[in-house]
Amino acid sequence: MVGAVIDLFCGVGGLTHGLILEGFGVLAGIDNDPSCKYAYEQNNRTRFIEKSISEVDGRELNALYPNNQHKILVGCAPCQDFSQYTKKSRTGTKWQLLTEFSRLIREIEPDIISMENVPEVRTFNRGEVFNNFIQSLEQLGYHVSHSVVHCPDYGIPQQRDRLVLFAAKQGVIKIIPPTHTPENYRTVRDVIGSLATNYSGGHWEGDSMHAASRLEDINLRRIQHSVPGGTWADWPEELIAECHKKESGESYGSVYGRMEWDKVAPTITTQCNGYGNGRFGHPEQDRAISLREAALLQTFPRSYQFAPEGQLKFKTVSRQIGNAVPVALGRVIAKSIKRFLEGLHERQRVRIII
């Protein structure tokens, strides 16, 4: 085991799963959403603690860490208040979760910390929230680094940019170099091209997650007139919604769109099961992408289960998938920490020899 990890705001376990695949031992995941418990525990074989972070005490988490392992604390605070998709409110309360994260860091004093979030967290409230968080870490003696990751550069097949922060007391952790270039980005075809044909409202018997939302008649007609990468402007006049005919509607070109086979997907959101919620139409089949396809584009393994058989709820699972840290990004974070620890151990070994 490389190190012992506790995952705050763990959701269904995207970050946890990436860490486990890279050899880390995850002691527990903490989240206040009880619907995530099944997927988290079923796929990761570790403990799910249903609590709000404000209810968590550092002493109870410290008791979980073994004495002979590096203590690692990771988390992805809910990002809706920071995201460009929710600019309406600039006075939200979810940023206070960073304050709670900072409190737990003070109480636990982990060896290594990692946080993943949207890039907008750096400028939210004129940068005050993020800068205060960094200052609190530095005051505790941590070396802090952060960078914006363009997910396709690391084999994640969607247009997703994420802020990744590291902090360690024994040096600076740097993110590993990119593994892909635009010439060999993983595409929609690479990831979902082999799945069975499906249809609007269809379920595939071999996988309950390969299920697509049922389209209303008008939306079925719309997707039949949609081309990959196109917009609602490609439709006949009678299919265009009145709101899109207004000047203000021109800025919503990606809604009711199809993905393109040989490009990366758009950002997978919490409403990725709906054709009208973004460019979530299948590249050639007349339907929205299925839940399994959305999960694969978030780099979850095909075997990842999100609900017990017969208890699948579209909106719940779609939200879980959209909120998740892509598993492959979890592996990038894990590899970056592992490389740092290997370098640290090598330096310590050299000192002993000398």
From Swiss-Prot:
Keywords: DNA-binding, Methyltransferase, Restriction system, S-adenosyl-L-methionine, Transferase. Residues 3-344 form the SAM-dependent MTase C5-type domain. PROSITE patterns: C5_MTASE_1, C5_MTASE_2, SAM_MT_C5. GO terms for biological process: DNA restriction-modification system; methylation. GO terms for molecular function: DNA (cytosine-5-)-methyltransferase activity; DNA binding. Gene3D superfamilies: DNA Methylase, subunit A, domain 2, Vaccinia Virus protein VP39. The active site is at 79. Its EC number is 2.1.1.37. It catalyses: a 2'-deoxycytidine in DNA + S-adenosyl-L-methionine = a 5-methyl-2'-deoxycytidine in DNA + S-adenosyl-L-homocysteine + H(+). A methylase that recognizes the double-stranded sequence 5'-GTCGAC-3', methylates C-? on both strands and protects the DNA from cleavage by the HgiDII endonuclease. Belongs to the class I-like SAM-binding methyltransferase superfamily. C5-methyltransferase family. NCBIfam families: dcm (TIGR00675). This is Type II methylase M.HgiDII.
